[in-house]
Design a protein with these regions (language model features):
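N-terminal presequence-like segments and the immediate start of the first folded domain
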Residues: 1-58, 62-75, 82-135
């Protein structure tokens, strides 16, 4: 594993991610923003933020597996949520938890959450980018 995740003392400990990732590998993997499309390009969970978050994470898992990686190799996530408000956090966490259970992982690398006005198509409520480092 080329990534070590750390919560430094002096920074708040966040349940859903770590504050710092230390990358020691040499192969960088940049995964395009994943939306809630299945393998056929059909939107999963129309109108359901939790279902869409879950599908985004599953898509990232598929992309990582294709290049010989896993969520253990993820150094950074960027999450874009349409019309973000803090009351959407439980849905975001529910989707993450469901994906983690299916993938057998805990996706806790450093993450940035950004509220956006819109994504590529109106049905998409969330998009997630990942950067990974492989040995």
């Amino acid at each position: 594993m080329a990534i070590t995740l750390v919560n430094p003392s002096g920074l708040p400990e966040i349940d859903v991610y770590r504050q710092v990732s230390i990358a020691t590998g040499s192969k960088l993997v940049f995964i395009a923003g994943q939306v809630a499309w299945d393998a056929e390009g059909i939107t999963v969970g129309e109108g359901d933020l939790a279902a869409q978050v879950e599908q985004c994470y599953l898509n990232i898992g598929t992309a990582l597996a294709e290049v010989g990686g896993s969520f253990d190799d993820v150094a950074k996530l960027t999450v874009y949520v349409v019309d973000w408000t803090p009351d959407k956090m439980p849905l975001l966490l529910e989707g993450m938890s469901r994906a983690a259970a299916k993938l057998g992982i805990t996706p806790v690398p450093p993450a940035t959450l950004l509220g956006v006005a819109a994504l590529d198509v109106p049905d998409h409520l969330v998009e997630i980018e990942a950067t990974a480092v492989l040995d």
